[in-house]
């Protein structure tokens, strides 16, 4: 059973949101104003897909990988487990082996490693590639983090991205889990129906479960 109300775990999108160094900064502007045309305000958004809270499609790191429109939409809705792993330099089997994850399909990891989301971090606790096989065997199909990537920020190989995809695990990044306690929740974090895209912004929300 669900308890209480939905909790927004998405980054707010405005000029203060951090972007990958060299990537497109977020901007919103009104192209047609009600004052000028007498009817409506019509805005335009310009942003990188990998800004704020977003999902990665395999095409992001694999030219032959699935695009957003090809992803199983049900993976982004349903029961999720939130766990806390603060003060880690990386996250692997050793960090998770003492946590019971049987029956968990969607795993959200709160690291508390990215405090000021108006500034892109210098380093993050990345996912160790061998964790993918371990999580897959447990039945995990979606991993979410309060970080901009699952790999080291200077990685060119993106080994964790590839291993997760090879084991059927989808990636959700940039969550805001600061006030979320460990436990079981209902998650909704739906990507847009982007036909050619390598990722999508999402509005991620949680509701506590009994």
Regions found by a protein language model. Give the residues of each.
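Active-/binding-site microenvironments in catalytic and ligand-binding cores
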Residues: 1-210
């Amino acid at each position: 059973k669900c308890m209480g109300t939905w909790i927004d775990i998405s980054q707010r999108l405005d000029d203060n949101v951090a972007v990958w160094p060299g990537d497109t900064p977020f901007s919103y502007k009104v192209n047609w104003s009600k004052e000028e045309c007498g009817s409506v305000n019509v805005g335009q958004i310009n942003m990188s897909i990998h800004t704020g809270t977003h999902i990665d499609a395999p095409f992001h790191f694999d030219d032959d990988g699935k695009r957003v429109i090809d992803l199983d939409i049900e993976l982004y809705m349903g029961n999720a487990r939130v766990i806390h792993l603060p003060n880690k330099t990386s996250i692997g089997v050793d960090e998770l082996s003492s946590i019971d994850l049987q029956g968990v399909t969607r795993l959200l990891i709160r690291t508390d490693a990215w405090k000021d989301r108006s500034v892109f971090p210098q380093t993050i606790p990345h996912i160790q590639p061998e964790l993918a096989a371990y999580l897959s065997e447990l039945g995990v199909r979606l991993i979410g983090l309060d970080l901009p990537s699952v790999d080291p920020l200077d990685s060119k190989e993106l080994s964790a991205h590839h291993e997760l995809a090879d084991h059927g695990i989808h990636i959700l990044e940039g969550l805001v889990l600061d006030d979320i306690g460990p436990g079981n929740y209902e998650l909704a974090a739906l990507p847009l129906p982007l036909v050619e895209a390598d990722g999508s912004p999402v509005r991620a929300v949680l509701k506590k479960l009994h």
